[in-house]
Amino acid sequence: MAHPVQSEFPSAQEPGSAAFLDLPEMEILLTKAENKDDKTLNLSKTLSGPLDLEQNSQGLPFKAISEGHLEAPLPRSPSRASSRRASSIATTSYAQDQEAPRDYLILAVVACFCPVWPLNLIPLIISIMSRSSMQQGNVDGARRLGRLARLLSITLIIMGIVIIMVAVTVNFTVQKK
């Protein structure tokens, strides 16, 4: 089935299309980038040469360039970089970001030996969920689940100790009578 020959680029009069090369910011971004010392960095010939525009499924042009063609990355604005660093320093320390969050699996297993039987399986399950979240790359979720497993394990261990103390106390007071 033959298609009529279409131009490679849509005309500027068509609705929804934009003349990408008419924008001065686009030309500046495609041809040069400045580093901190105001020295011009040369990009590869694929960026400074003619644009390779292709049609996507909606009929709009897009540029097809892989990341390997860049010789130097475009610099980020200093205000964004400094605000990112400041917010990350204010919220968490560098050492906390580098270490993996604990899942408290051993503490959850110890809690399983306490006499609060159906409830002491919950920290074990949450601890395993924390470990799997860490393996999937969800560090915040793993940290949150690890803390919850620790809290529940400690709570159930204390409840188990209280139950044992009550049982021993009742046992010795009943034998004396």
Swiss-Prot record:
Residues 72-88 have a biased composition (Low complexity). It is found in: Cell membrane; Endomembrane system; Cytoplasm, Perinuclear region. Expressed at high levels in heart, mammary gland, adrenal gland, stomach, smooth muscle and skeletal muscle, and at lower levels in brain and lung. Strongly down-regulated in lung cancer tissues, due to hypermethylation of the corresponding locus. Expressed in adipose tissue. GO terms for biological process: cellular response to insulin stimulus; endosome to plasma membrane protein transport; glucose import in response to insulin stimulus; protein localization to plasma membrane; vesicle fusion to plasma membrane. Residues 71-92 are annotated as: Disordered. The modification Phosphoserine is found at residues 48, 87-88. Its main location: membrane. Residues 106-126 dip into the membrane without crossing it. It is a single-pass membrane protein. The chain crosses the membrane at residues 154-174. Residues 175-177 are extracellular. Residues 1-105, 127-153 are cytoplasmic. GO terms for cellular component: cytoplasmic vesicle membrane; endomembrane system; membrane; perinuclear region of cytoplasm; plasma membrane. Keywords: Cell membrane, Cytoplasm, Membrane, Phosphoprotein, Transmembrane, Transmembrane helix. Regulates insulin-mediated adipose tissue glucose uptake and transport by modulation of SLC2A4 recycling. Not required for SLC2A4 membrane fusion upon an initial stimulus, but rather is necessary for proper protein recycling during prolonged insulin stimulation. Interacts with SLC2A4; the interaction is required for proper SLC2A4 reacycling after insulin stimulation. Belongs to the CD225/Dispanin family. This is Trafficking regulator of GLUT4 1. The gene is TRARG1.
